[in-house]
């Protein structure tokens, strides 16, 4: 295969990550690759000054630091993508450790058109024997990790913690959902949207990165935001029956109240646009991946 000059923009959304940002970048810069890349850090109103070290000259010329005012992880990633210079976008959490040539191996799957989006296997930093290979959903729309399969394979859900996507594919589906103001379901929504628009999402089990699974978030995550995102996702992509089932999953808050908020925010306009432009419907998606919902 003739090597083309594909370059990668690596985008890290950051909020109150403490020493993780520095550790992650140290791992990245020490890891072998033949691929040229840029690093974009979107510091979304961190309160712990975790990105201040990037002002030092040693890091300054290696990293493009963007500061945002608490826009949430979805929009922070989109802002990073808009600033990206290269044709491939690699979204990463700011608490990862890498293996040699991980970027090269992921990029090969896209360059050879084996898939449109790819994630590596993701191991726990605390116990690297625990590894997940892409994700699917259970009957209450909760995440379940796949076991290992030989070779590249399709996955219903791409974990947001580490994945590579062509820039034009990302923007063709409108990026991460701009109506998600807080953390929750942003990778699930993007994955479903990609499949419905006819793009393939895959896991490359030959690449493993380590991810710090945290006991709790370093910033406030509340039920309201998570439920809002869940129901908004349903309104964007699901049929009426599944929208109703999604409302039934809202137990710690008033479903009616959350539904009113979702509808007030103009979700139906975007839904109509998606229904016009997609290649498959939610019925196909849930059947195809054998998700009983």
Name the predicted role of every residue range.
Residues 101-137:
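Conserved donor NDP-sugar-binding/catalytic core segment of glycosyltransferases
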Residues 93-97:
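The conserved acidic donor/metal-binding loop of glycosyltransferases
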Residues 74, 146-164:
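A recurrent flexible, glycine/aromatic-enriched loop bordering the glycosyltransferase active site
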Residues 43-53, 70:
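A conserved acidic beta->alpha catalytic loop
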Residues 26-36:
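Short, acidic, metal-binding catalytic loop of nucleotide-sugar glycosyltransferases
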Residues 89:
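Short aromatic/hydrophobic "clamp" motif used to bind/position activated sugar donors
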Residues 68-84:
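Glycine-rich, basic loop-to-helix element that forms the pyrophosphate-binding segment
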Residues 222-293:
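Terminal low-complexity segments of carbohydrate-biosynthetic enzymes
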């Amino acid at each position: 295969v003739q090597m083309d000059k594909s370059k990668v923009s690596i985008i890290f959304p950051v909020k109150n990550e403490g020493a993780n940002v520095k550790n992650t970048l140290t791992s990245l810069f020490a890891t072998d690759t033949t691929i040229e890349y840029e690093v974009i850090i979107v510091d979304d109103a961190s309160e712990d000054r975790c990105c201040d070290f990037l002002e030092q000259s040693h890091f300054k010329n290696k990293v493009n630091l963007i500061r945002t005012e608490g826009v949430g992880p979805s929009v922070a990633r989109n802002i990073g993508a808009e600033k990206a210079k290269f044709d491939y976008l690699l979204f990463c959490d700011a608490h990862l450790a890498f293996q040699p040539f991980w970027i090269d191996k992921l990029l090969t799957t896209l360059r050879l058109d084996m898939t449109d989006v790819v994630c590596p296997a993701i191991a726990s930093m605390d116990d690297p024997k625990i590894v997940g290979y892409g994700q699917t959903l259970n009957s209450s729309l909760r995440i379940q990790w796949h076991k290992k399969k030989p070779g590249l394979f399709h996955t219903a859900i791409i974990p947001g913690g580490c994945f590579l996507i062509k820039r034009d594919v990302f923007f063709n589906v409108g990026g991460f959902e701009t109506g998600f103001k807080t953390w929750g379901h942003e990778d699930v929504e993007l994955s479903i949207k990609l499949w419905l628009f006819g793009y393939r999402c895959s896991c490359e089990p030959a690449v493993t990165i380590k991810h710090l699974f945290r006991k709790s978030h370093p910033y406030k995550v509340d039920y309201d935001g998570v439920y809002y995102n869940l129901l908004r996702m349903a309104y964007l992509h699901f049929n009426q029956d599944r929208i109703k089932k999604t409302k039934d999953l809202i137990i710690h808050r008033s479903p009616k109240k959350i539904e009113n908020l979702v509808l007030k925010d103009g979700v139906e306009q975007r839904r109509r646009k998606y229904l016009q432009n997609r290649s498959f419907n939610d019925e196909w998606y849930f059947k195809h991946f054998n998700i009983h919902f």
